Amino acid sequence: MRRNRRGSPARPAARFVRPAIPSALSVALLVCTPGLATADPQTDTIAALIADVAKANQRLQDLSDEVQAEQESVNKAMVDVETARDNAAAAEDDLEVSQRAVKDANAAIAAAQHRFDTFAAATYMNGPSVSYLSASSPDEIIATVTAAKTLSASSQAVMANLQRARTERVNTESAARLAKQKADKAAADAKASQDAAVAALTETRRKFDEQREEVQRLAAERDAAQARLQAARLVAWSSEGGQGAPPFRMWDPGSGPAGGRAWDGLWDPTLPMIPSANIPGDPIAVVNQVLGISATSAQVTANMGRKFLEQLGILQPTDTGITNAPAGSAQGRIPRVYGRQASEYVIRRGMSQIGVPYSWGGGNAAGPSKGIDSGAGTVGFDCSGLVLYSFAGVGIKLPHYSGSQYNLGRKIPSSQMRRGDVIFYGPNGSQHVTIYLGNGQMLEAPDVGLKVRVAPVRTAGMTPYVVRYIEY
């Protein structure tokens, strides 16, 4: 759900580089002044120190990527549990239908058997009402033949009905057994998904504790390397007879990133933001809480979808309110003629949340909400939560995971994206998602410590395709 912190709005070939962490190139530009190019030993020393700083920054960036991957694994686990539980509920419904069909088949057999027994007993006790031998006229003979044919046809019909009822019972019992197997498997899958989500939450908490310590260690290494680099630069500058202020920015570990402002001391923006381990004691409670919110969100989406279709004057009695395009189809419930209107409504809905804080796992169809872990105490949105909320206004139901959102809708080459399309970042859209506004701008819930905002589109790390949920 979160974007890769390495990003650049410059050009597609650029790498993601966290703005707050100075790159090797930026340090080199500060160091390689004309006055420093004459002393080869000093230049070699400075080059080595630049490499040390770059390596330290890269290790911090790698750790930041690991944190993002851990958060995404939890978000995906939640979606998997929701899907598995939905499948289990559907399988239980199918099982109930099959069981009712078996009961109906048994009742049909009992009725057919009763009719057959009654007919057989009557035939045995009474025999033909009139025999050929006792017929006294041609009319009586004809009546006897007709009665015999009718009796035979009736007997065959009763037996056929009984056989058909027995065949239907065999089929319904077979279907019921299959439905039971599917229901059992779906229930087992749901349990396995829940166990996986609990394990992901627990493992994430453990890793965050370790990564928090690792950040401090790597930060100390980075600061030490930066201090050595600065000392070497000062020596080189002094050896060239430098006077006045040095021709490069002096680095102070307490002053914030180069060229930036000092921070408030709560966290260092040049370091990866490790979520606090404030997951409640029972991870199952977290899973159930998140899925409860998700179920409510689905109902809210359906209600808003019906309301939107009603406003357009195209609501049908059979409409569920969910307007997503069905699998394999590019056209959803919203006709193309109303597509632009729907897309603008989505954008207005999303833009209304500008300034709302980022909250990992936060956001649903009804609005901002408390998330999980670092987002547990913050009412807000993460990236996919904001997209989910925006499109819910027109009845488009989306999962709360950017990787799953990427697999819905119609994929369009990113070079052809238009206002209202959805932009994804990372492998298979698994790291970040935004809404394209046009003119090179996008709406996003960016990262921990930031707020929903409009920002320039970043091409680095963007998937080859954007996704179009609304056609027009």
Curated annotation (Swiss-Prot):
Exported by the Tat system. The position of the signal peptide cleavage has not been experimentally proven. PROSITE patterns: NLPC_P60. Keywords: Cell wall biogenesis/degradation, Hydrolase, Protease, Secreted, Signal, Thiol protease. Its main location: secreted. It comes from the Bacteria. Peptidoglycan endopeptidase that cleaves the bond between D-glutamate and meso-diaminopimelate. Binds and degrades high-molecular weight peptidoglycan from a number of Actinobacteria; activity is increased in the presence of RpfB and inhibited by PBP1A (ponA1). Required for normal separation of daughter cells after cell division and for cell wall integrity. Required for host cell invasion and intracellular survival in host macrophages. SUPFAM superfamilies: Cysteine proteinases. Optimum pH is between 5 and 5.5. MoxR1-mediated folding is critical for secretion via the TAT system. The synergistic effects on peptidoglycan degradation of RipA plus RpfB are inhibited by addition of PBP1A (ponA1). GO terms for cellular component: extracellular region; peptidoglycan-based cell wall. It is found in: Secreted. Pfam families: NLPC_P60. This is Peptidoglycan endopeptidase RipA. The gene is ripA. InterPro entries: NLP_P60_dom (IPR000064), Papain-like_cys_pep_sf (IPR038765), PG_Endopeptidase_C40 (IPR051794), RipA (IPR049836). Monomer. Interacts with RpfB and PBP1A (ponA1) via residues 448-472 of RipA, interacts with RpfE. Interacts with the chaperone MoxR1. RipA-MoxR1 interaction in the cytoplasm leads to proper folding of RipA, resulting in its secretion. Also interacts with Mce2B. The keyword Amino-acid biosynthesis does not apply. Belongs to the peptidase C40 family. One of its GO terms (molecular function) is N-acetylmuramoyl-L-alanine amidase activity.
